[in-house]
Amino acid sequence: MEQQDPIKKEGRLTPVLALATLIAAFGSSFQYGYNVAAVNSPAELMKAFYNETHYSRFSEYISEFSLTLLWSISVSMFPFGGFVGSLMVGPLVNRLGRKGTLLFNNIFSIVPAILMGTSKTARSYEMIILSRLLVGICAGLSSNVVPMYLGELSPKNLRGALGVVPQLFITVGILVAQIVGLRSLLATEEGWPILLGLTAIPAALQLLLLPFFPESPRYLLIQKKDAAAAKNALKRLRGWDDVDAEMEEIQLEDEAEKAAGIISVLTMFRMRSLRWQVISIIILMGGQQLSGVNAIYYYADQIYLSAGVKDQDVQYVTVGTGAVNVLMTICAVFVVEYLGRRALLLLGFSVCFIACCVLTVALALQDRVSWMPYISIVCVISYVIGHALGPSPIPALLITEVFLQSSRSAAYMVGGTVHWLSNFAVGLVFPFIQVGLGAYSFIIFAVICLLTTIYIFLIVPETKGKTFVEINHIFTKMNKVSDVHPAKDELKDIPLSAVEL
């Protein structure tokens, strides 16, 4: 009975854990958000630069078709790079560790920042295209590795809140890019190279500061077999010396899957014991992007203009929308441990479903009913709120929670690949859908939101307050297997009370 006190001890947000979270999220996740939005404001200025560069080389201006193609390639290089970065996650985190991968990833930020910052002086739009590929790789790695790193650093009672922090910094990065990208600031003929090059600042800070913080204790113990280093990391993160209970929980996870080793993506797809976990992350990551979030932002400017917002003022309304996104993600940080992951997903996708349905009606009637454009604005804001509460931050957090150490890196590769391919698909296909369906384009996204909501309600369990082993114990029942991995009986024999933290 005396040994149960440390087992029930809850983790706290120590200075080391808080700073490691902030440095990892600012140095990596912030860059992702910043580079998503950085090219939006100066787009016309950059196209003019492409045209002038072509003229200086060939004494003729580029054709409209070729200019559109070049710009489309420049924009699409980012999600393509994200896809490439997602494929690199598994090999890098298993070889370099979680922290080591984040440090290595700064190469894909600092180098392109220098290239983009000097591209105008060098008169080379090829440098911008290459840089967009490189910052995309950076985003593909950071969008997967930061949630994994923070999820493995956190005690279970803070895992949800800290797991939402990467998405919070993505939204902050978007907002900062929107602010510094105002026409009165850096969205100018001389300022846009600086705007693009600023992404080097968070990378440099992370490169300087993150080495002083611990590697993932789970990586150190389970994959590196370094119990002493894992224990020291836990002591620093928890702020106390008595970490035996948590060490025991990690060792139980190691024992429960010792025969599996490091699982590859192909092996993971073949394993019956991981069937519903894999299906769930594919549906959640696909639903996150295919629910229409990028389409909403794409359409937002037209909606604001139709409501009477002046063209020169749309940029300020866009900043306001970005601020709402940040505020609601902050709310998610504080309520995720109270309401749980499942509730936020259900709430978020339901709000997005309703917003898409009402927006469809509002867009269809806006030429006949004078006040409908204002309903459209309400729908856009409501959609942003709903997505920020659940669909944006929770899926990446769940990948950390529903997979054990041996399969987690492969799971992030799959989830990241689905995320970036879905992102790319929406960007490629939505303009054609908009031309073909017009106001009814958002019905497609409403259906996807509804189907994702139904799946979550029927299949996805609540993971709040549970250890990784306990969560996988839930899935063994769903997968109709007796243990975590085939041919092993450890999990069913592990008393759940023994792995409480």
Swiss-Prot record:
GO terms for molecular function: D-glucose transmembrane transporter activity; fructose binding; fructose transmembrane transporter activity. SUPFAM superfamilies: MFS general substrate transporter. One of its GO terms (cellular component) is apical plasma membrane. It catalyses: D-fructose(out) = D-fructose(in). Residues 40-68, 120-126, 183-192, 299-313, 364-371, 434-439 are extracellular. Keywords: Acetylation, Cell membrane, Glycoprotein, Membrane, Sugar transport, Transmembrane, Transmembrane helix, Transport. The chain crosses the membrane at residues 19-39, 69-91, 99-119, 127-149, 162-182, 193-213, 278-298, 314-334, 343-363, 372-394, 413-433, 440-460. The modification N-acetylmethionine is found at residue 1. Residues 1-18, 92-98, 150-161, 214-277, 335-342, 395-412, 461-501 are cytoplasmic. InterPro entries: Fru_transpt_5 (IPR002442), GLUT (IPR045263), MFS_dom (IPR020846), MFS_sugar_transport-like (IPR005828), MFS_trans_sf (IPR036259), Sugar/inositol_transpt (IPR003663), Sugar_transporter_CS (IPR005829). It is a multi-pass membrane protein. Glycans are attached at residue 51. It comes from the Eukaryota. D-fructose binds at residues 32, 167, 288, 296-298, 387, 419-420. It is found in: Apical cell membrane; Cell membrane; Cell membrane, Sarcolemma. Its main location: membrane. Belongs to the major facilitator superfamily. Sugar transporter (TC 2.A.1.1) family. Glucose transporter subfamily. Functions as a fructose transporter that has only low activity with other monosaccharides. Can mediate the uptake of deoxyglucose, but with low efficiency. Essential for fructose uptake in the small intestine. Plays a role in the regulation of salt uptake and blood pressure in response to dietary fructose. Required for the development of high blood pressure in response to high dietary fructose intake. This is Solute carrier family 2, facilitated glucose transporter member 5. It comes from Equus caballus (Horse).
